[in-house]
């Protein structure tokens, strides 16, 4: 029993909770640094030759489950331990503190008033119902009072005592929701060309929906740097009686029927070329060896002798660079411009078709996450409300009215109010 109590004391301590939070923050940072969810070969190939921090090679990454940090047993165990720590702290400290603050404390002796943060006294006449007058004044000022025969206990701002408990509940819901989302969330990245569609199935409701990319555009700065990617999507579903068009932008996802669709990326998927009076629609692939966001394709050009040429492009407005793979000399081909003669073939660029990179995510834990943040914000705000307490004692033998006060926050502000009330009571 003693061991169990000592364990609870340790788990519910602030130092222990802070240690867990720091550990979670560090491991979460590692999870963003190391790519998550790739196959084992990726980690072995990339980290055996260049270990992380000089000692974490591919085998150690896999063994320590750093390839899936957020669903690893040790990360989830830490979340559970933090939940237990917060719950233990709530039951051991917050709830008893709240219960204690609900009890009315009586100060029947003038000696006790000298120990309070603020105290003063005034002479009174034996005649007059001073307690009733003070009680009425305090109630008008928004104080909750408990009147006795010769003394009054008053308090205000008790809701501030609930704040830490609400924050703890919000954090527990956040941790549980995060763990739940790690196992239940589904995510899919899809590139769509204008006119292409994607069928979505919600397994929990067995409902189907079709998402069609109506239009995709890119806003650019004056220097050509991408500013915003915009996808106009049509959602259609007979099961859900749905047919509407919504717009997804970077940092402005679409939320619909439990799904969240993010505008995540873009690509140049296709170019339409006219080669010797024949139209060709060529599929492009990203070529990271040449540069960031450069797409290209290898084609044969020439009416008599065929030679290989590399076509590359990095902007939906062009130009398309045509390079000879032997010496990488090349020319730029502009959109809807005059044809270029390349190895005796006439080539013109008719159309550049960019595709929209979308991430479609189904995360049942989102409502829990949002609700937890609401609780945390609400709890933090109300915890800033000071809890003030007043005691008034009438001693007819010494013909003195004593006033004392306590405040857990903003003592300066409470001090001003305290002496203002004292002057009003003095005038009785």
UniProtKB/Swiss-Prot annotation:
Instruction: Name the GO cellular-component terms.
Output: plasma membrane-derived thylakoid membrane
Superkingdom of the source? Bacteria
Any Pfam family: ResB
Entry keyword annotation includes Membrane: yes
Keyword vocabulary terms for this entry:
Cytochrome c-type biogenesis, Membrane, Thylakoid, Transmembrane, Transmembrane helix
Q: Which residues cross the membrane?
A: 14-34, 72-92, 162-182
For membrane topology, the record states: Multi-pass membrane protein
Its recorded name reads Cytochrome c biogenesis protein CcsB
Q: Which organism is it from?
A: Prochlorococcus marinus (strain MIT 9215)
Gene that this sequence comes from: ccsB
